[in-house]
From Swiss-Prot:
Name used for this protein in its record: Pro-MCH 1
Entry's family note: Belongs to the melanin-concentrating hormone family.
Leader sequence residues: 1-24
PANTHER family in the record: MELANIN-CONCENTRATING HORMONE, PRO-MCH
Gene Ontology process terms (BP): chemical synaptic transmission; neuropeptide signaling pathway
GO MF term list: melanin-concentrating hormone activity; type 1 melanin-concentrating hormone receptor binding
InterPro entries: Prepro-melanin_conc_hormone
The gene coding this protein: mch1
Gene Ontology CC: one annotated term: synapse
Keyword line: Cleavage on pair of basic residues, Disulfide bond, Hormone, Neuropeptide, Signal
Described purpose of this protein according to its UniProt entry: Plays a role in skin pigmentation by antagonizing the action of melanotropin alpha. Induces melanin concentration within the melanophores. May participate in the control of the hypothalamo-pituitary adrenal gland axis by inhibiting the release of ACTH.
Highest rank taxon of the organism: Eukaryota
Length: 132
């Protein structure tokens, strides 16, 4: 019942809006419209010149800063514990050194620098994943 009343009222509103007859403006009226537009433009220019930075210097100005609330959350409280620990340890501690076994590679002296990433199982394989 509610959907039918709403759809009928919407259809009537659209029909009345589209059915209003359009009228032509005579040439004499056209000059008046242009004159009104010119006066509006001049008033806006006066208002803009009054609010110019030169005239604001005498008055006290307010600075408003807007920020996304997600930025504030991620500053300290929103980070997971392991990220906070890695950030507190410093950039040199964030990377770990792993050595390969002698049987895996021909040159065991080469060290591999690997980031500490989480591993998620995708299908049958563990892949690196990121926190959502």
């Amino acid at each position: 019942m509610r959907h039918s009343v709403l759809s009928i009222s919407f259809a009537v509103a659209l029909f009345l809006e589209c059915y209003t007859p359009s009228t032509a403006i005579p040439i004499g009226k056209m000059d008046d419209v242009a004159l009104e537009q010119d006066t509006l433009d001049s008033l806006l220019r006066v208002e803009v010149s009054e609010n110019s930075p030169d005239s604001v210097r005498g008055r006290s100005s307010k600075i408003v800063l807007l920020a996304d609330s997600g930025l504030w959350m991620n500053l300290n409280r929103g980070l997971p514990l392991y990220k906070l620990i890695a950030a507190a340890a410093g950039p040199d501690r964030a990377l770990t050194l792993d050595r390969r076994e002698a049987g895996q590679d021909l040159s065991p002296s080469i060290s591999i620098v690997r980031r500490d990433t989480m591993r998620c199982m995708v299908g049958r394989v563990y892949r690196p994943c990121w926190e959502v």
